[in-house]
Amino acid sequence: RDMTTPESRDRFVGIQISPISFVDEGVDTVLDTLKDRVGINVLMLGTVSWLGLKSGRSISHELDGWPDHGVPEPYQMRGGAYFDPDPRYYTDTFMADYRSRDPEFSGRDILKMVVPAAHERGIKVYVELMEPFFKYAGHGSAGTVEIPTLAQAMEVDLLGRLGGDPSTSNPGYRRWIHSMIEDQVRNHHIDGVMWCNERNSPLDTLIQGGAPGDFSEPARKEAVERGINVERCRQALLRLYDFMQEAAAGKQFPDGSLITFLRVLLDNPEALIWEKFWLERNKDLDRELYGLVKWCKPELPFGLNVWNRNHFNPIRRAQWPWAEQTLYADFVKPITYQHQAGEVWSRELSFFRTTILRDFEPDQATRALFRILGLNEAPFDELVATGMDPDSYVHGQCADALRGVDGKAKVYMGIGVDAPRTLPETAKCSRDIVYRSVMATYRAGGHGVVLAPNYASMHLTHLDGVAQAL
């Protein structure tokens, strides 16, 4: 391994932070601490969300305890916009009234609170947004979303049921996303936008045991406009759905689960037509937002916060090449939450081992998939407790992203600092892990780091590893 010290140069040192930290600790205290103690020069500020991981305090305090700053009490977050939306931008969407009703933010606009004070200190402010915005498992979601008729804009699955996420083909919902971002870009002196897209594709959903969509009326119309036979695609997905349900129930297949899956897929190729249609419409949203930001303010950076499942899942890895993303992103932030990564891998593998890789032992499947994905980490039975090694995992993913973008976009590595754990045996974060992750980024040639997922759950003593590395 190349263990040399990274070159001394101007670095992008960002941190994802929720609005509540500025209320709990005070704007000046937070900014001075992050700049003077840690070395932060960019805030990735969550401005719109119904997810505690983006807008609240620690969502894993019951397991991890409270950090060494902030308010050590659960936050009864209701979610929404933590700035004052400009009504002129929302005349053509049902989501015009989405201002947060959290009492802590009554009369407070987080962008007006933070941006001027940050700029006085030479700190840039990017808005940080994640889709899905609502009821996202593992992200501390608000239990109730107080937006009338939102439930009617949901996806429809292949069984005809309203799904768990709004349909991004629904014109009113898609226009709201456009309007919400244009509002912030035009009306506030922000320095950039980071957008995260974490939707499961139809194949994703099938492998996880669900019934995929989107068969809502707007999505069907878009498919027909592209010459797609919607019903044939739905029937093909039903065949795959039946197979996945049988595999999960333990049915024995003469040729094994993997070969049987491939046979069903090849016999029903329309399922891949729907997968491709869904994927392109999903990417279209990213492309639209890039264009929107550039039309409003051509100099404003727009980047992608890239799901770690894209390097843990061979199907997603094939679907989301880095080179393509440089066509609609100025920077990418690969998520490499190293101490949490073993738990994430275990969950990802469990989906495959319930269905198409059911005949493989966990360590067999892990070793094979690691080889395919270019990962070199601990054996499966040690992985959750040890996490993934910064010197191999963070360095390797940074090098991979740099090769992929080929100089056409910046690479800011997403460094996990006290990312929420859901299992007591999951590796804990430490100052050393954080230090080695930052060092690994710069040794690989990365352009910067983004400490994530939320300052409200980070220990300052662990963030000291960033300062040590810098």
Protein language model regions, located:
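Aromatic-lined carbohydrate-recognition surfaces of secreted/lumenal glycan-active proteins
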Residues: 16, 123-136, 194-198, 229-254, ...
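Active-site-adjacent "subsite" loops/lids of carbohydrate-active enzymes
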Residues: 8-23, 81-116, 126-188, 212-228, ...
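Aromatic- and acid-rich polysaccharide-binding/catalytic face
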Residues: 196, 234-272, 319-386, 446-457
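Aromatic- and acidic-residue-enriched segments that line the glycan-binding/catalytic groove
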Residues: 53-80, 133-160, 196-262, 345-363
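Substrate-binding cleft/loops of secretory-pathway carbohydrate-active enzymes
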Residues: 134-145, 202-204, 296-345, 422-443
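Substrate-binding cleft of secreted/luminal carbohydrate-active enzymes
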Residues: 41-53, 328-347, 374-468
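Catalytic domains of carbohydrate-active enzymes, especially glycoside hydrolases
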Residues: 28-56, 70-83, 183, 187-192, ...
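An active-site-proximal structural segment forming one wall of the substrate-binding cleft
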Residues: 33-40, 114-117, 164-201, 240, ...
